[in-house]
Regions:
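Catalytic-site microenvironment of enzymes
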Residues: 33-34, 110
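Domain-terminus/edge residues, biased toward the C-terminal soluble/receptor-binding domains
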Residues: 219-220, 233-236, 240-241, 246-358
Length: 358
């Protein structure tokens, strides 16, 4: 019996020891698993940290490099770009001036104080007609040479019979300066094509440059497909974009000198060597003496545009009695009478009253 009890006790002890060893192995496995997980976690965190530092450093270097190269360019120029411009995203009323709902758009801009005095639908896309030639002039003045002598091509005179033209014939030779006068004063479509071919190498290349320069000026709601403004459904702008382009042109004294003239005599040399002269009268009624500016307002000049689709349009450079500059624009009037009646009323209230108070 004693032997049996002893055997039972030994058996129990062996069982208990085995259970303890099993439990110990189990704990060790758990500990090893925990250690393994912790090691993996530490390695992962270390790798993430290293990657972050590398990425952060390269990103910082990239940002610094980008800022160094692009400061005062693109988005960095936003504040500077708008600082010298009249800016509004909404309509602006002008006390004393009654809105004309029949117009496509209208605006009056105080250039000295960078203030929008009046705005009605100035961000609405409309057909520009020959106000297109404002951008044609901008590109020509920027990239062309006014002393160049240009030979008129067959393409430049290949226009519909009812198109406004200066009267050139293929083979005629005329200076770039004369062409600019024909473009801006008389709104010659043949002058626009001749300028585009000479300055751009081709009409297509010149129009591409027009679009590039328009975007650079902030005229992002504008698209050109030709340099003259004869109707094309893919050619459009806004009254505000037109202000931006005209305002840029007005910084060039030559542009102001040309549009301020009451007439211009051009000298043309024909293909056979004969010379002849022609006189161009401005198409805007104020400069031509067919409309009278309001008291206290001096209309220096501007650019007109008229097609069936665009209606009657005009953009003007004006001064008050203190010679402070203003740009006024009306697009989409049903008739020229309405166009100039509304423009006179707008200038009288927005500019003339300021002069009377000085």
């Amino acid at each position: 019996v004693k032997c049996t009890n002893k055997n039972k006790k030994q058996t129990q002890n062996s069982y208990d020891a085995a259970r303890r060893r099993k439990a110990l192995r189990k704990r060790r496995r758990r500990q090893q698993q925990i250690v393994t997980v912790l090691v993996i976690l530490i390695l992962c965190l270390t790798a993430i940290g290293i990657a972050y530092l590398i990425h952060s450093g390269s990103k910082k270097d990239y940002v610094i490099d980008y800022e160094t190269k692009n400061y005062n360019k693109s988005l960095y120029k936003g504040d500077t770009f708008a600082k010298d411009l009249c800016v509004t995203s909404n309509n602006v009323s002008l006390e004393g001036y009654a809105d004309d709902d029949s117009l496509g758009a209208a605006g009056l801009f105080d250039i000295k104080n960078n203030t929008v005095l009046y705005a009605d639908n100035i961000h609405t896309q409309l057909y520009p007609a020959s106000t297109t030639k404002v951008m044609t002039a901008y590109v020509a003045l920027k990239y062309g040479n006014l002393d160049d002598i240009v030979t008129i091509s067959e393409n430049a005179v290949n226009l519909d019979a009812d198109a406004q033209v200066c009267g050139f014939e293929a083979g005629d030779q005329v200076s770039m300066y004369d062409l600019m006068n024909g473009l801006l004063l008389y709104s010659g479509n043949d002058a626009a094509l001749a300028i585009a071919e000479h300055v751009g190498g081709s009409v297509e290349a010149f129009v591409q440059k027009m679009n590039e320069e328009a975007k650079a000026l902030g005229a992002t709601n504008t698209n050109f497909v030709n340099p003259h403004g004869l109707h094309d459904p893919q050619q459009y702008t806004t009254a505000y974009d037109l202000y931006l382009m005209f305002n840029a042109c007005s910084k060039n004294p030559t542009f102001i000198d040309i549009i301020s003239q009451k007439s211009y005599s051009a000298t043309i040399t024909s293909a056979d060597g004969d010379q002849w002269t022609t006189e161009w009268i401005p198409t805007n009624y104020y400069s031509a003496g067919e409309a009278t500016p309001p008291e206290g307002v001096n209309v220096l000049g501007g650019k007109t545009g008229t097609t069936d689709e665009a209606g009657s349009c005009v953009i003007l450079y004006n001064q008050d009695m203190e010679s402070n500059p203003y740009i006024s624009v009306i697009m989409g009037a049903d008739t020229k009478t309405i166009l100039y009646d509304d423009m006179t009323a707008l200038l009288a209230v927005g500019v003339g009253t300021k002069s009377s108070k000085n």
